[in-house]
Regions:
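Compositionally biased, low-structure terminal segments
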Residues: 19, 24, 62, 68-71, ...
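Polar low-complexity intrinsically disordered regions enriched in Ser/Thr and small residues
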Residues: 7, 16, 58, 63-65, ...
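Short, positively charged, Gly/Tyr-enriched micro-motifs
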Residues: 67-124
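N-terminal alpha-helical interaction blocks
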Residues: 1-48
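Generic alpha-helix signal with a bias toward terminal, lower-confidence helices
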Residues: 21, 30, 53-55, 79, ...
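Feature targets compositionally biased, intrinsically disordered low-complexity regions
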Residues: 3, 12, 54, 59-61, ...
Length: 124
């Protein structure tokens, strides 16, 4: 529903693996900040099971992770990401490995990869 517009705001490739489920614009709770409004975008992982997981059953979603992304139209942007959990035929729980397909955050940060690299260049 929101994906056409969201494709302009989200990191490249995100919509291949996640769907936008909601968004919200909320006032920033902090004072003395650059942005007085926050744009929250909620993403749920799509069914991206590889063939070796075809016998698994969806077990809902794991805990939500939040990442900061580029500000959009003078609004701090926060991505809320929920990854799927799968129950395998042997009863174990597993998630689809996305690390080689898409990097949601820059290692050691809570920033999207592109935003972290931008900040690193801006800071010298």
């Amino acid at each position: 529903m929101y994906e056409g517009l969201a494709s302009y705001f989200l990191p490249t490739g995100v919509l291949k693996y996640f769907e936008v489920t909601d968004f919200a614009e909320v006032p920033t709770l902090e004072t003395e900040v650059l942005y007085t409004t926050e744009l929250h975008i909620y993403l749920d992982e799509r069914d991206n099971r590889p063939p070796d997981m075809s016998g698994s059953v969806s077990d809902g979603f794991g805990d939500e992770s939040c990442f900061l992304d580029f500000p959009a139209r003078d609004k701090k942007t926060v991505l809320h990401v929920r990854r799927r959990r799968w129950t395998m035929p042997d009863g174990t729980t597993k998630s689809v490995g996305l690390d080689k397909k898409i990097q949601l955050k820059h290692p050691g940060t809570r920033y999207s990869k592109d935003f972290a690299l931008f900040l690193k260049k801006a800071d010298g």
